[in-house]
Design a protein with these regions (language model features):
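Short catalytic/ligand-binding loop motif for oxyanion handling, primarily in non-cytosolic enzymes
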Residues: 29-34, 92-95, 111-116, 167-171
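A short acidic, glycine-rich active-site loop
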Residues: 127-140
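PAPS-dependent sulfotransferase catalytic core
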Residues: 1-81, 193-205
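Conserved phosphate-donor/acceptor-positioning beta-strand/loop module used by diverse small-molecule
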Residues: 99-118
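Catalytic phosphate/metal-binding cores of nucleic-acid and nucleotide-processing enzymes, i.e., regions
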Residues: 76, 123-124
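The conserved 3'-phosphoadenosine-5'-phosphosulfate
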Residues: 49-57, 151-207
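Hydrophobic/aromatic beta-strand patches that form the interior of the parallel beta-sheet core
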Residues: 20, 85, 102-104, 159-161
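Short glycine-/polar-rich loops that comprise or flank the Walker A/P-loop
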Residues: 97-102, 154-157
């Protein structure tokens, strides 16, 4: 009788879960990485308010509450363990230290990022208030500062992913990301997301 009872006891998964964060500068490939992880079977924290468009054919995968991190909006973290959420690099420093994070940090040539941002603004009939040279310097300083900060956070593991290499070699990077996360993911579906035809605004063209 007791053996039967114990044999049917539920198995409790005691594996510690991390909050998975996709980060980087805007237009660095964060939405594509979110799409990859979603296709790979990782639960995504998103509100789907902002739909896919010409600027982001893969969708935006945004979650409005994270935009209030600097204001102390942290309630969403209670439901974030084991899920992936997109957070721009400027907000990473506001993540509380009582959680553990796996950060996938997207890197892309700054000239490509600026060119992509300019095209997005142009489609919306808007103009940047800052010239590219100034913006590039600001981005470079920000990236140096955030990398310095990340390297000193005991509760954060980080992998840096180069956008252009991911586009041209998605299989290799999908495996690396899966190993970094340490959770079951469908690598084949992940690697099917990057599309070189969507690799616009290359560094050689963004002069």
């Amino acid at each position: 009788m007791l053996r039967k009872l114990f044999s049917h006891s539920p198995v409790v998964d005691k594996t510690p879960k991390n909050v998975i964060v996709v980060s980087g500068l805007p237009r660095s490939g964060t939405s594509m990485m979110m799409k990859m992880l979603a296709e790979g079977g990782v639960p995504v924290l998103t509100d789907e308010i902002r739909n896919a468009d010409e600027d982001n054919p893969n969708g935006y995968y945004e979650f409005e509450p994270v935009k209030q991190l600097a204001d102390g909006q942290l309630s969403w973290l209670a439901n974030a363990n084991g899920k992936v959420v997109k957070i721009i690099s400027a907000l990473l420093e506001y993540l509380p230290g009582d959680h553990h994070y796996k950060v996938i940090f997207m890197e892309r040539a700054i000239r490509e990022i600026l060119a992509s941002q300019q095209k997005m603004l142009s489609r919306r009939n808007e103009k940047s208030a800052t010239v590219d040279e100034v913006m590039q310097k600001q981005f470079e300083q920000h990236l140096a500062a955030i990398k310095f900060w990340l390297a000193r956070q005991p509760n954060i593991d980080v992998i840096f992913v180069e956008y252009n290499k991911l586009i041209t070699n998605p299989d290799e990077y999908s495996v690396k990301i899966a190993e970094f996360l340490g959770i079951p993911v469908n690598v084949e579906k992940m690697s099917s997301v990057p599309n070189e035809r969507l690799y616009r605004n290359r560094a050689g063209d963004a002069r």
